[in-house]
């Protein structure tokens, strides 16, 4: 889990727009966040395996 201070800092508007970055809405992870879902790859995989994200399924070929 991310520090609460870092999550609060990310929620504040950045002084410059180039400093803004995305964080996972569930765990607060700053890296590998999918913009379409707003969550990180770890949480995305967990929710997809549980079937909680409609239209998303594990690929097999």
UniProtKB/Swiss-Prot annotation:
Alphabetized, the UniProt keywords read: Metal-binding, Ribonucleoprotein, Ribosomal protein, RNA-binding, rRNA-binding, Zinc
Q: Name one GO biological process term.
A: translation
One Gene Ontology MF term: zinc ion binding
Q: Out of the domains of life, which is the source?
A: Bacteria
Named cofactor requirement(s): Zn(2+)
Q: Which residues bind Zn(2+)?
A: 24, 27, 40, 43
User: Hey, which family's this protein in?
Assistant: Belongs to the universal ribosomal protein uS14 family. Zinc-binding uS14 subfamily.
The protein's job, in short, is: Binds 16S rRNA, required for the assembly of 30S particles and may also be responsible for determining the conformation of the 16S rRNA at the A site.
- The name on file for this protein is Small ribosomal subunit protein uS14
Q: Which organism is it from?
A: Campylobacter hominis (strain ATCC BAA-381 / DSM 21671 / CCUG 45161 / LMG 19568 / NCTC 13146 / CH001A)
Taxonomic classification: Bacteria, Pseudomonadati, Campylobacterota, Epsilonproteobacteria, Campylobacterales
Gene symbol of the encoding locus: rpsZ
């Amino acid at each position: 889990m991310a520090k609460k201070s870092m999550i609060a800092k990310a929620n504040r508007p950045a002084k410059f727009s180039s400093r803004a970055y995305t964080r996972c809405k569930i765990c607060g992870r700053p890296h590998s966040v999918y913009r379409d879902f707003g969550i990180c790859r770890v949480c995305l995989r967990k929710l997809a395996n549980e079937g909680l994200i409609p239209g998303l399924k594990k690929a097999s070929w």
